[in-house]
Amino acid sequence: MPAEEGEMADWSMEEALRMALRLEEENFVEYEKNAAEATNPGVKSMFLFLAGEERNHMKLIREKMGPFNVKP
């Protein structure tokens, strides 16, 4: 279980990586949902771009988990 939010400096690498991945996953889902609901093509495009960025971040975080033996 992660330390209290105010104590992030005391988190382990595993806690930090898991938190980062969870936040990226939540943002990805939200951007995908917003893109699906958008009626303005420009707004839809922006949300799809942001979802793609989150997908890239998730990939990077998963790659960082390996050397620390953290499973996604």
List the predicted regions and their residue ranges:
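Non-heme di-metal
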Residues: 1-72
